[in-house]
Amino acid sequence: NLDSDDDGDLLKDDEEKSSDPATDSLNPDTDGDGFCDGPVTIADVCEAIDAFPTDETEWFDSDGDGIGDNSDPDVDGDGVDNEQDDFPDDPSASKDTDGDGMPDTITGNSTSDPALVEDLDDDNDGLTDIEEDVNGNGTFDDGETNSLDPDTDDDGYCDGNVTIVDVCVAVDAFPLDSSEWLDTDGDGVGNEADTDDDGDNVQDDADQFPKNPDESLDTDGDGIGNNADDDDDNDERKDDNDAFPLD
């Protein structure tokens, strides 16, 4: 019996001779690039299967566009060039804002193994994309924090409760106001504008502890507020036995 597949690559000899361009029916790897002409792997010879069996510089064509992956500027054919694509081999995703390996969005089915999983917090600031996109229209609008930017107002304080090294510190009480970030007393007025940051009814310029609502005076200057200090004037006589505790 005549062997109809002399090189054992699962391509009939007649197929190889009549293909355009023709492959070598006596050589399972016509172009010698390590990938077999046909749909079979031959141990110690070549792996299946070469999308370009007569071109030694190409073997894969991930998106099936006729351009080999080695020269294709958009390997996965998703419309985003490889250099700008965080997932150049998977057409379902292209952007990973926070660099955590999870794509901002997934369109269609992921071809990765294991499959990609969509990131629910694209900027990794501790606020989910849904929380930031209040009106749910998928775009960054006035009155919303940016789901692709952990510090929307660029004041150095993060929108959410996560500190991101070299980017921002958690957490901004006013994520849309670059001039405010803290609100010590929670009165809705930022510390930069508030004249009584701790809300103890002592103005900051007269308060020795402007961020501590339990203290405002330190008579002896020892760093302990009078309310906690048991010897306010530091005369070595306890306040409860001192007729002049502030003198």
Which residues does each PLM region occupy?
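Extracellular calcium-associated, cysteine-rich motifs in secreted modular proteins
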Residues: N1-D247
